[in-house]
């Protein structure tokens, strides 16, 4: 799993400037895409992070360490510099 977490952290690119906000939950998510065509959504409740990924036709969930999750959110905030929107789903 460590290789998957490293790939998410190093190779993931933000698909757009939208923060996903599901109805009636306290979760927020970011869409990530990868060069080989895989996709993930990085979810957080403010304390814990996990990624729900689709790769090679399979869906799987990966727990993300807080330090890496915080770093990905910080990169998102720096990239879009407050120019992001919420997507209610």
For the regions a language model picked out, list residue spans one by one.
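Function-determining sites in protein domains
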Residues: 1-89
